[in-house]
């Protein structure tokens, strides 16, 4: 089992690396999901996520598509987008992923990994928003 600390990591790069690990059969736990970052203009990011959460079908709005508002679920959904979700292999890989807001008691004191290729120090521009800020904007509880 790999425990990854998402603090200061770029969400898309983190998700692609985690998806690869899951497809290789590893169990992955992501902690501090609310501290992952999304790069780009603040207003554009908020508008994009707001539009996603408001998407519905015209015939029956209860059919979806459904996009999450909580920060841990936003990270899970991003990883899911990088897996072959419609195949059995992709669904089994997705079940091996656990995402947490903060650090749960069961993982306190354990050593966390980080993904150097996904760290925000590689950014050329300081424009970014944390996943926690996006979740708060959408009305998420965490």
Swiss-Prot record:
The keyword Ribosomal protein applies. The keyword Membrane does not apply. GO terms for cellular component: cytosolic large ribosomal subunit; ribosome. One of its GO terms (biological process) is negative regulation of translation. GO terms for molecular function: mRNA binding; structural constituent of ribosome. Disulfide bonds: none annotated. It comes from the Archaea. Keywords: Ribonucleoprotein, Ribosomal protein. InterPro entries: Ribosomal_uL13, Ribosomal_uL13_bac-type, Ribosomal_uL13_CS, Ribosomal_uL13_euk/arc, Ribosomal_uL13_sf. Pfam families: Ribosomal_L13. Belongs to the universal ribosomal protein uL13 family. Part of the 50S ribosomal subunit. This protein is one of the early assembly proteins of the 50S ribosomal subunit, although it is not seen to bind rRNA by itself. It is important during the early stages of 50S assembly. This is Large ribosomal subunit protein uL13. It comes from Thermococcus kodakarensis (strain ATCC BAA-918 / JCM 12380 / KOD1).
């Amino acid at each position: 089992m790999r425990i990854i600390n998402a603090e200061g990591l770029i969400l898309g790069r983190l998700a692609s690396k985690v998806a690869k690990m899951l497809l290789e059969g590893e169990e992955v736990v992501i902690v501090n999901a609310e501290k992952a970052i999304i790069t780009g203009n603040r207003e554009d990011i908020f508008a994009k996520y707001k539009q996603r959460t408001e998407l519905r079908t015209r015939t029956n709005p209860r059919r979806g598509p459904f996009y999450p508002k909580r920060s841990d679920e936003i990270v899970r959904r991003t990883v899911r987008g990088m897996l072959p979700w419609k195949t059995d292999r992709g669904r089994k890989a997705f079940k091996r992923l656990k995402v947490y807001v903060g650090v749960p008691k069961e993982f306190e004191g354990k050593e966390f990994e980080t993904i150097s290729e996904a760290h925000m120090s590689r950014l050329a521009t300081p424009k970014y928003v944390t996943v926690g800020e996006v979740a708060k904007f959408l009305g998420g509880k965490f």
